[in-house]
């Protein structure tokens, strides 16, 4: 499981940072990629990665500001031109209005897609659990921005315990099909009468990962709730230390406020995202250094960077 950042800038693209988009790569878990936001130029960034567009099965939009959605029509259209690849349907989750934006863009441009898009729109009254599969659950909660904006909490369900092969061998269980039966929870009786209780040879379930991905927001309690015990918290850092007033006026957060959220939530790792173009390389190190005085395990991400979860 990895996150690859396709756009880490704020508001408008710069030479170093594209506008908002990241890919949650779940290839080992479910052979899918989930996209979070799709700012202008997202498909160009994808061309610089190993991501195959048809593997993108779900797109989660945080809000309808242009730097988070203007890349959708282009990506959806280009996804239709994947030669020699099976066309797969796509799901888009986002605030009310995302369906109208996408369909209007496709209609006006005369674009026809050989796959279906299934839209899941929500508003303030229909948040909470928005998706549940056999391996993942996704929650959405409203943040505090200048327009309706949400954050997402992606929870991997507990993983099966591992089989203790050495212990089984010591108990006289021959390697082969019996191992598979025990792994599936089946109790056995060996030829010599030895009873094998599957539970004695399988470790306890391992907790799944928790990934919190926030849209644009002021510091708010919703951010903390979404990030409780998160393995990774992706939080915007449009402004730096001392800019709390201007950040609030524009519906954004500082690096220090993001660090405070991480502390209050008990998150394990903080990734600062949505970085303003006014921060030069030397200022980026200061963003991290200042935030680390509050929350030590912090990192400022950059475009195309891949982070293992």
From Swiss-Prot:
Pfam families: Lactamase_B (PF00753). The keyword Hydrolase applies. Its cofactor is Zn(2+). Zn(2+) 1 binds at residues 63, 65, 145, 216. Zn(2+) 2 binds at residues 67-68, 216, 274. GO terms for molecular function: 3'-tRNA processing endoribonuclease activity; zinc ion binding. The active site is at residue 67. Binds 2 Zn(2+) ions. InterPro entries: Metallo-B-lactamas (IPR001279), RibonucZ/Hydroxyglut_hydro (IPR036866), RNase_Z/BN (IPR013471). Keywords: Endonuclease, Hydrolase, Metal-binding, Nuclease, tRNA processing, Zinc. Its EC number is 3.1.26.11. It catalyses: Endonucleolytic cleavage of RNA, removing extra 3' nucleotides from tRNA precursor, generating 3' termini of tRNAs. A 3'-hydroxy group is left at the tRNA terminus and a 5'-phosphoryl group is left at the trailer molecule. Homodimer. Belongs to the RNase Z family. Zinc phosphodiesterase, which displays some tRNA 3'-processing endonuclease activity. Probably involved in tRNA maturation, by removing a 3'-trailer from precursor tRNA. PANTHER family: ZINC PHOSPHODIESTERASE ELAC PROTEIN 1. This is Ribonuclease Z.
